[in-house]
Amino acid sequence: MLTFNQNRSHSLEQSLKEGYAQMAELNLSLATEAFPLECEACDCNETYLISNYKSE
């Protein structure tokens, strides 16, 4: 009985780890779609805003 409970516990733990990994991958892919990492216009705009802030 103890072995069964240990196997069941290990199986549940493994399932949770896999589920969390899948959720993390999904969140990352959704974030990448929503906020592209390489956005030259965003970089230029950020530089412009920072330079204006420093000059004031």
UniProtKB/Swiss-Prot annotation:
Keyword check for Nuclease: no
GO-annotated biological processes: regulation of DNA-templated transcription
Keywords: Toxin-antitoxin system
Gene that this sequence comes from: mazE
Stated role: Antitoxin component of a type II toxin-antitoxin (TA) system. Labile antitoxin that binds to cognate MazF toxin and counteracts its endoribonuclease activity.
Species of the source: Staphylococcus haemolyticus (strain JCSC1435)
InterPro entries hit by this protein: Arc_rbn_hlx_hlx, MazE
Signal peptide: none
Transport in keyword set: no
Name of this protein: Antitoxin MazE
Family the UniProt entry places it in: Belongs to the MazE/EndoAI family.
